[in-house]
Amino acid sequence: MSVIKQLFSKLSSLKFKRKTAIQKETTAQIDILKNKGFEVLSVTKTEKANLIMYRHFLDDIPEEEEIRIFIGISVITSKGRSGRDPMLKAFFKNNFTTISLEDIEMADSFINQGLGSMLLNALLDIAKKRNIRRITGEISRVDIGHIERLVHFYEKHNFEVILCSDSADVYKIGDLVWNRS
């Protein structure tokens, strides 16, 4: 066998081993999530990772009575599970007629990879399934350093972004509103 064929053979073998390792870790993480009572919403395979989107339910509360909404994404690479899971936090209010979006938490290493869109789309799916017509939220003052990116992100998902003209508010710099059409 030529040297080039040997190199390609070894490279193919390494790729297969990485894919197998990612798949095994993905299966293990799915089992862990299900054993904790989480609902696995989807598993997405990308070139470099598997993404397990899940919803965290609190113990002994039926889904239709659950006020809190926690949606996370476990990122599995060939090195294992990648750090803290990106997480969306929201809650139902006004007798389950509105959702209030609290936060989308994400490590810098996950920004601009589509994970925030996946989380927000999952929340929008919940709103549509539950016939929720409105989602509200605030843009926190801690996000002022990347406000342009946030405005683009929320407008891309059909949210109205209302930036505050009053700089005296120490907690927020804007409001978010999504109305189901």
Identify the role of each PLM range.
Residues 1-111, 121, 125-138, 148, ...:
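Non-catalytic substrate-recognition and accessory regions of acyl/acetyltransferase enzymes
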Residues 117:
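Residues forming the Rossmann-fold NAD(P)(H) cofactor-binding site
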Residues 140-144:
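Short histidine/acidic/glycine/proline-rich micro-motifs that form metal-
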Residues 114:
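Glycine-rich phosphate-binding loop
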